[in-house]
Swiss-Prot record:
Subcellular location(s) of the protein: Membrane; Cell projection, Cilium, Photoreceptor outer segment
Major place of residence: membrane
Interaction with SAG: annotated segments: 330-348
PANTHER family for this protein: OPSIN
Phosphoserine modified-residue sites: S334, S338, S343
Entry protein name: Rhodopsin
Organismal lineage: Eukaryota, Metazoa, Chordata, Craniata, Vertebrata
Residue(s) carrying N6-(retinylidene)lysine: K296
GO cellular component: membrane; photoreceptor disc membrane; photoreceptor inner segment membrane; photoreceptor outer segment membrane; plasma membrane
Lipidation (S-palmitoyl cysteine): C322, C323
Alphabetical keyword list: Acetylation, Cell projection, Chromophore, Disulfide bond, G-protein coupled receptor, Glycoprotein, Lipoprotein, Membrane, Metal-binding, Palmitate, Phosphoprotein, Photoreceptor protein, Receptor, Retinal protein, Sensory transduction, Transducer, Transmembrane, Transmembrane helix, Vision, Zinc
Origin species: Caluromys philander (Bare-tailed woolly opossum)
């Protein structure tokens, strides 16, 4: 083994020289220079400064404008709530621990930080699954008389939380565990050891199959069918121009969210899978730190994509920020929004 395993941690550094200390008790400056820990803290501060206002604004604008309370937007709001959980439950903790160079909150704090980070990421993933299924039903129409309504959206939101909790909660009750990872300032699932006492191997396999592979298969199936249907409908002109435009814009927004999710989370998942399948291999703390911290940007990019690509929401947001006045040049966006609002598709 090229790392050092303790009762509730695994440090990716050999203790042959006797320098390894518990990441819950002393700074880990033998893993990286102090300035590198400061860079992590600065990065987390940036995510907090960006993540809180933009997600809070998403919630506030939707509450202020009744026309935004559509079934599809329920799922998008669910993402904003999950992102706020990550900001308050995870980012603030990681900022503080990075400034100190070790996880000062102890094993219990590690459990909480790891739980919120995992919960937020899984809610985002399962929300994308629900959005993909919604797009598939609306555009491909496998059930001709089905209309995605408020009750379906609420069930979709509940489903995302149930599945996310099914992934994030087991390590809190003895199936696997949360431990500090990388430079030991943030916590995640234990991919580093088999730890038979907590059946770690079976949980990691369960997580990769049920909470990563299956969602990805569903998402790619839905969008594969969707792309084919959109091309076929465009060729046959089966829908009105307004409806086609609305469906394409909403679909484009959701596809971009999926791509952004993959860009942020695939490096983390790939490195975690490599470490798990190569137990005892030599890897440095930076190898897991960079993808783990990069994955946290998911709390920022979803609302940014939503605001940039959803004309109706953008107009409502600017109206809220400008104290009820529609800014000059947004009349066209407002008109477009009012047209697409009546479509079977959610506003875009």
């Amino acid at each position: 083994m090229n790392g050092t395993e303790g009762p509730n941690f695994y440090v990716p550094f050999s203790n042959k020289t006797g320098v390894v200390r518990s990441p819950f008790e002393e700074p880990q400056y033998y893993l990286a220079e102090p300035w590198q820990f400061s860079c992590l803290a600065a990065y987390m501060f940036m995510l907090i400064v960006l993540g809180f206002p933009i997600n809070f604004l998403t919630l506030y604008v939707t509450i202020q404008h009744k026309k935004l309370r559509t079934p599809l937007n329920y799922i998008l709001l669910n993402l904003a709530i999950a992102d706020l959980f990550m900001v308050f439950g995870g980012f603030t903790t990681t900022l503080y621990t990075s400034l100190h160079g070790y996880f000062v909150f102890g094993p219990t704090g590690c459990d909480l930080e790891g739980f919120f980070a995992t919960l937020g990421g899984e809610i985002a993933l399962w929300s994308l699954v629900v959005l993909a299924i919604e797009r598939y039903i609306v555009v491909c129409k496998p059930m001709s008389n089905f209309r995605f309504g408020e009750n379906h959206a609420i069930m979709g939101v509940a489903f995302t939380w149930v599945m996310a909790l099914a992934c994030a909660a087991p390590p809190l009750v003895g199936w696997s565990r949360y431990i500090p990872e990388g430079m030991q300032c943030s916590c995640g699932i234990d991919y580093y050891t088999l730890k038979p006492e907590v059946n770690n191997e079976s949980f990691v396999i369960y997580m990769f199959v049920v909470h990563f592979t299956i969602p990805m298969v569903v998402i790619f199936f839905c969008y594969g069918q969707l792309v084919f249907t959109v091309k076929e409908a465009a060729a046959q002109q089966q829908e009105s121009a307004t409806t086609q435009k609305a469906e394409k814009e909403v679909t484009r927004m959701v596809i971009i969210m999926v791509i952004a999710f993959l860009i942020c989370w695939l490096p983390y998942a790939g490195v975690a899978f490599y470490i798990f399948t190569h137990q005892g291999s030599n890897f440095g703390p930076i190898l897991m730190t960079l993808p783990a911290f990069f994955a946290k940007t998911s709390a920022v990019y979803n609302p940014v994509i939503y605001i940039m690509l959803n004309k109706q929401f953008r107009t409502c947001m600017l109206t809220t920020l400008c104290c009820g006045k529609i800014p000059l040049g947004d009349d066209e966006a407002s008109a477009t929004a009012s047209k697409t609002e009546t479509s079977q598709v959610a506003p875009a």
